Design a protein with these regions (language model features):
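Structured, active/binding-site neighborhoods that engage oxygen-rich ligands
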Residues: 1-177
């Protein structure tokens, strides 16, 4: 992910577009390099779909964590500028994801940009939250976990109240949701 993002920015510049991302994927990696949302998006590119349609057309994984995994580089190249990191992450994520799938990448990129100039973990997390919609499920869930932590809940208690009780993977939710 880091190498691909680096090549993208070197070739298309910091103002790259989602279409630049899709073209880089097609030019630089094989179709077998991807899984879940990214594999569907790649197939959609090959079938002529451009972003953002490439993200949602027949893509049941469109809100999973694949884009979140790609967010690191945009945080690294924007130290102290979480807004720029999140904006670049949005453009990258929008080719393969929608809603919380996009917000995850924005959240990670913003936190890494902030972490370059700040060591306060709560401030870093709140910075990440400030870059995603307050109405999103990701914002709600990360806020719950943060509040549980600040209230002194143990890791196990936090898992139980914030994850297992809310998202039972036996009840229609995959853990990647």
């Amino acid at each position: 992910c880091l190498v691909m993002a680096n090549l993208l920015v070197r070739q298309a510049g910091r103002a790259f577009t989602p279409t630049d991302v899709s073209k880089a994927w097609l030019a630089l990696q094989s179709k077998n390099a991807y899984f879940t949302a990214e594999r569907i998006a790649y197939r959609n590119f090959m079938n002529g779909f451009l972003p953002p349609e490439s993200a949602w057309y027949k893509n049941p994984y469109r809100e999973w964590i694949g884009a979140q995994i790609r967010g690191d580089y945009f945080g690294y190249i924007n130290p102290g500028n979480p807004e720029a990191a999140a904006e670049m992450a949005f453009r990258d994520a929008s080719i393969s994801h929608v809603k919380n799938g996009i917000y995850g990448e924005m959240f990670v990129a913003a936190m890494l940009a902030k972490a370059a100039v700040c060591s306060d973990m709560e401030e870093i997390i709140r910075t990440g939250l400030s870059e995603i919609p307050e109405s999103s499920r990701l914002f709600e869930q990360v806020s719950r976990v943060l509040e549980a932590y600040l209230a002194g809940a143990s890791f196990e208690e936090t898992l139980q109240t914030c994850l297992y009780c809310r998202y039972d993977d036996q009840n229609g939710h995959h853990w990647c949701h």
